[in-house]
Amino acid sequence: MESIPILIIAFNRPDRLINLIESLRATKPPVVRVAVDGPRVGRPGDPRRVSETRAAVQRIDWTSDVATLIHDTNLGCERAAPAAVSWVLNEFESVIVFEDDAVLGPQFIEFATRALREFNYRNDIFHVNGYNVVPHDMLTNPAATARLSRVPGGGGACLFSGADPGA
């Protein structure tokens, strides 16, 4: 069964990206794509922080199937994130997306993979979302729930290339 790629969308927060990478290390996803937006003009600290963020990608050392999309100039979240998702969906049928400040619970990748496979052929479902407001030290609690909603939210998102968002 083909692995579903992980897409990490990052910018200028290397410490947050490192935390996400370390949380991914527990499940070691075999296919990882990372998109890093460029520094903003007129923000003196951005070039250094963006450079450190790009360097942090090297911590993904559990797989050789890592590719990066590096923007030299800043596109902003409203353009960089959709460009990153399109970049991955040009190669794969679906993707699990994380922003750089996400920290995953141990079951999320399995949940997302199962959800993508189960709902992949339903045109009325555009994405599956994971969000947990439980404090970080409680994430090891084995009690996990899922619910369906018509309103998308933040957190980890699992996207399908063939879904019709207007359905």
Predicted features by range, described:
Residues 26-69:
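Acidic donor-binding segment of Leloir-type glycosyltransferases
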Residues 73-80:
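A short, glycine-/small-residue-rich helix N-cap motif at loop->alpha-helix starts
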Residues 82-94:
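Active-site nucleotide-sugar/metal-binding loop of Leloir-type enzymes
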Residues 153-167:
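Conserved nucleotide-sugar donor-binding
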Residues 92-103:
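Short beta-strand-to-loop acidic/aromatic patch adjacent to the donor-nucleotide binding site
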Residues 1-27, 35:
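N-proximal low-complexity "stem/linker" segments adjacent to membrane-targeting elements
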Residues 107-143:
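Conserved donor NDP-sugar-binding/catalytic core segment of glycosyltransferases
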